[in-house]
Amino acid sequence: MKKSKIIILITLITLTFSACTKKESSKTTTPETKTTVEKNESVSTTWMDVTSIKSVYVDTGIFEHIGFAVPAANLPKENILAGVKYHGTSITLENESKPDTIMWPFSKGIKEEELEDFTSSKGVKIKVPVQSKLNFAPLDNTMKICRDNGLKMRGHVLVWHSQTPKTFFCEDYNASKGFVSAKEMDARQEWYIKSVFQHTKDWEAKNNNGNIIIYAWDIVNEAISDNASASAYLRDGSNWYAIYKNADFIVSAFQYANKYAPKEVLLAYNDYNEFQGEKHNGYLKIIDLILAEKNNPELPSRIDIAGMQSHNQTGWPSMIEYETCIKNFIAKGLDIHITELDITGSWKGGNNFNKADPEAQKRTYNQYFKLYQKYRKTENTNGITGITFWGITDENSWRGNASPLLFNHFEPKPAYYGVIEAAN
């Protein structure tokens, strides 16, 4: 009798323990299921379910690169990186390779003991920040991601009126002091350009068997005035212009870039509204000034690429005006990168634009990509070699309210199909 009671008691304990275990197991699986649902809801894969832009335009040999502008913090995100690799071959950092990021450690000033001697190619002796005062971490991290994922990169940008610390232009790197002379600024420019190219070359040598990751750089960006005239075409409100009063800083930048960049790295001038009247003529003058120093025996220049930003609208510019711009750049013996492509609706003033009508936007993208193919680079002619979209999805675009891109929340828009259909 006692034995039976013991058996019954053991059985009851076993059943109770089993029930508790199932109940506890049910509890622990609930958060896991919830996490999975949340992940699926937040990571849309719809842009991965359509034909890749790369397969249509790069794998077929039409262009060398299709690229996207991406903030450094977003690139490692699984859904973004996967889509960039699927649709493109190249990225451009929106901000992290600009001077204010790289010069950030001395943007508020620098101590005397953090300076070292530098002698320019023209024999000018100056003090410059030690290399440890340059912030290359975001650039290095991005090069590593590109290397690990088979991507290339456009460097953006070395010389620009914006996003460059004022300290870089001032005596003793002190923003409260006056500007340095053009002679000293020229030496500082050389030091900075040399530092960037030397760092990237060293990184690629150490971490990528010397193979190039950054295949092109925007050497000078947006130096032409929006109100350009035949006699005055340079942007005159910049610190660069305040010191030089002429285009010498543009030409010297391409001379120093040619001296320090690997020969396979393409050197570009980049601007917006590049097709427009006197601004376009100013662009052509800059190209001529750079080319004029091509055979300089002491410091030859080089320019390979005319960068057309192409922040355009569905009704502007006219296709004739845009095509003429392309033809004029090719006639200078340059290849072309479409560097920052997006298409909004009409302009409302300032940096405000109407939302693009979906069908008009699709039609415009379609017309552009037909035009780009018409003027693509061939064995015998210069031409367009790559197109970079300035962003991935509308909600993260700098002009997000105007819906300028091919994807919205990672879902393809009619504009995407306009791009794909242009190749068919």
Show the residue positions of the predicted features:
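Generic structural signal for well-ordered alpha-helices
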Residues: 50-54, 88, 139-146, 190-197, ...
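Bacterial N-terminal signal peptides
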Residues: 9-16
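Noncatalytic carbohydrate-binding groove/subsite architecture in carbohydrate-active enzymes
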Residues: 56, 62-63, 69, 75-80, ...
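Bacterial Sec-dependent N-terminal signal peptides
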Residues: 17-49
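Boundary/entry segment of secreted carbohydrate-active catalytic domains
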Residues: 37-98
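Hydrophobic faces of well-ordered beta-strands that scaffold small-molecule active sites
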Residues: 64-70, 89-93, 153-157, 215-219, ...
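Aromatic-rich peripheral "rim/lid" segments of glycoside hydrolase catalytic domains that contact
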Residues: 103, 223-224, 228-243, 321-337, ...
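Substrate-binding cleft and catalytic face of glycoside hydrolase catalytic domains
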Residues: 90-268, 272-274, 343-351
